[in-house]
């Protein structure tokens, strides 16, 4: 009998395969990083072939670590870094270009031109998104316009698009030999090409980017027993296992954090931060810089929508301290170093390396450290980096409360940065509400597993999934209201200093 569900978690810096039991507990996992390709300032790419090879390896190694066979898996889910764009030849599986990553800003002129022409409001109304470098539509257009032969190939049916969920799914289900070219509603909602009401590709939006509809994958529910097919026996699993769930990473974390009721929210701390608030079957149009997106759709049930605040640089700011500045040797050292000081000493670090995402949407912003004096040392910079993660989250929480009218009583958190206890305490202090971390911190992979397991009957319903969630640790706010207000005022002033640095044509 198949007693487990697996999940491919294809992220920005790594790919992992995780295996869960009926109680939602982790049984085994394996993870491998892939290269970050940085050809020039503002450009971020990944090698799709390397990602597929890593996917093969992590599946095989996780099964081996768990002493399991493929037949022990009832189903597989896929979750992924959203927006990251792959265009490949379906005849042979060869990418025409590297994957253009969600952080990449090369399409800033495309986004700016759409806004100037008045088309930004069309995109907001239909897709729920502002025209921004973040989303896939402009990335596809850039490849069509700048990579030799791709436009012609697309017109002949020899170039197809997918985010990395689609790329992994296509390869797992056969690749050039009948691979399924499909995605789910959550990933499609991040392209600027899907109408949120019809849950289908929109011809007017496609026309804005001059993208042939034939390039695009079929859009399916996030959880479905048949829509995504089965793994091919010639592929890494050597068995036909149903792929029954697909979700973008932040929507998967929302499912994994069991935020199934309107008003429930979670914040994932990874390379960036992503705060998602369930708004139920109601489409809430943001007036304060947030995104309207699809949270999930299970089977034939109506789609559940969400408001999202996406922050480009949070955990990657800690990586910057490690890799570029070399003031720490590991991410964990950021906490140790930050604890050497009592506060930030009056300095603020705004890590706008890729511009500012929600709620500002300023691609012209660039990173800044302000308030420096000779007194400051590495401890203050480490502390300011952790505070930057938390202040950016407060920006989003305030916008979310204005849009929804929902006051946050507790913030559910997950992701790698939540292992940093000091950062989570700072988050509670800056927000003024408790912060709660679950026992199973890998909620992104868990959410993909839940979607697959629900579709195949491994789990009965969301009520059963709620019983799995347990709190591991809670942080209560300790700052006074005066300190909280003073700190946030300083942060807002620092943000102003980052604007108008990068010219947008």
From Swiss-Prot:
Domain of life of the native organism: Bacteria
Q: Which InterPro entries match?
A: ATPase_NBD, Carb_kinase_FGGY, Carb_kinase_FGGY_CS, FGGY_C, FGGY_N, Glycerol_kin
Q: Which UniProt keywords apply?
A: ATP-binding, Glycerol metabolism, Kinase, Nucleotide-binding, Transferase
Residue sites binding ADP per the record? 12, 16, 271, 315, 416, 420
What are the binding positions for ATP in this chain?
12-14, 271, 315, 319, 416
Known catalytic reactions:
glycerol + ATP = sn-glycerol 3-phosphate + ADP + H(+)
Q: Which residues bind sn-glycerol 3-phosphate?
A: 12, 82-83, 134, 249
Query: Which pathway, metabolic or otherwise, does it act in?
Result: Polyol metabolism; glycerol degradation via glycerol kinase pathway; sn-glycerol 3-phosphate from glycerol: step 1/1
PROSITE patterns in UniProt: FGGY_KINASES_1, FGGY_KINASES_2
Q: Name one GO molecular function term.
A: glycerol kinase activity
Regulation of its function: Inhibited by fructose 1,6-bisphosphate (FBP).
Q: Which SUPFAM superfamilies match?
A: Actin-like ATPase domain
Function of the molecule: Key enzyme in the regulation of glycerol uptake and metabolism. Catalyzes the phosphorylation of glycerol to yield sn-glycerol 3-phosphate.
Record-given protein name: Glycerol kinase 3
